[in-house]
Amino acid sequence: MNRLRLVAIATFLIAYLSGCKSGYDGQLVGAADRPQWDNNLLPYGMVYVPSGTFTTGPSDQDINYSFNAKAKAISINGFYMDETEVTNNEYRQFVYWVKDSIAHMMIGGDHLLEGEDGTQSINWEMPIDWSANSEDAGALESMYYSEADRLYGVKDVDPRKLEYEFSWFLWRDAALRENFNKPRSTFIKKKKVAIYPDTLCWIRDFTYSYNEPMTRSYFSHPAYDDYPVVGVTWDQANAFCGWRTRLWNDNRSKNGEAPVDEFRLPIEHEWEYAARGGRIASPYPWGGPYLRNTKGCLLANFKPGRGNYPEDGGFYTVKSTAYWPNDYGLYNMAGNVAEWTLTAFFENSYSFVHDKNPDIRYDAKDEDPTTLKRKVIRGGSWKDVGYFLQTSTRSWEYQDSTKSYVGFRCVLPFLGRSMSDFN
């Protein structure tokens, strides 16, 4: 028996050593066993925006005389971008995931898996029974509104309980020479965010205006599933991006595939570059200079005249695929909802940002002045006049504000030089 064991071990060692020899043969050939990488990667619902250069800044008259977007030639690295704004139903997937993950943790038992290092993870194979008479009902009771807070006696989940914690790394702080020997944990930031959209923003945004049906139905009713999500803060949009990264990379890891970079909000100039669709000095995503086509039809969802909202076909928001896309295949880069960007708003930022992937950010703290909490929004919305639809127009909102006219879309950095290298 021992002899057979020795023969087996010797055979294994010979095969292993011969494999090493045939794999490298004393030559520099690169490390083996690298993860798989799909050269033709194209995330679902996104379009590829190639690297390029363009002149940012006004393509038409600066009617506000704000002078906060002077002309500047810049270069942008390639990236993927959502072809539409994130819709109610897409954001609802995030809400449901958070709700289910909290429920799994509260139920415990077979709903949790324990790793070799003692850490716990969720067993997503276990179903959750939300019925009132289920075995799980007692453990889940604290997720619901109290009886005094229930409307018509309906037992609804309290959206204030739906919190998601995400983290990010402060790369620029870590790059400072004086921080070279500091522990990695110094640069890891975490934030817990209540992720349910603020449905009351429809009432808050417009005084002496009847918008209660939108508050009751816009996010919850299937009629609006394909409409852009609104009422989300800048932090909520970032939390969504962090969850989306985790969701896809976890799946890729299970399949032995290399991870992708992080989904995130677009940098202001990435957004403008994509909105122009490769056109030069075009004031609108479709070119311009007019807001109507040759038949007199409006080309976006906005406020075309005083007291006139529905002429373009939409009283409020419209479906995320309404109107024609631009030359990159991106829908509603003008109108419908304005969109959050990653960029901090400073009036003079065009004067000092780099000409290669220009970027300026500021991680505002609660105690900071409100002016430091401004984030750039782009594209204009259903309630804005035509000026705000221009590809070069800059505007802003406070990062903790929720508006019925502000949504977002995600981008994903392209890894490599060009998509054409892989064809």
Where are each of the predicted segments found?
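A helicase ATPase "motif cassette" and its flanking acidic/Ser/Thr-rich regulatory loops
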Residues: 267
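A short, contiguous structural element within a folded domain that forms the immediate neighborhood
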Residues: 294-328
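Bacterial Sec-dependent N-terminal signal peptides
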Residues: 1-30, 37, 274
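Solvent-exposed, polar/charged alpha-helical surfaces in well-ordered, non-transmembrane soluble domains
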Residues: 89-96, 230, 235-242, 272
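Short loop/turn microsegments at loop-to-beta-strand junctions
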Residues: 44, 82, 261-262, 325-328
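Second-shell loop/turn segments in exported
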Residues: 76-81, 223-230
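Mature N-terminal segment immediately following signal peptide/propeptide cleavage
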Residues: 42-58
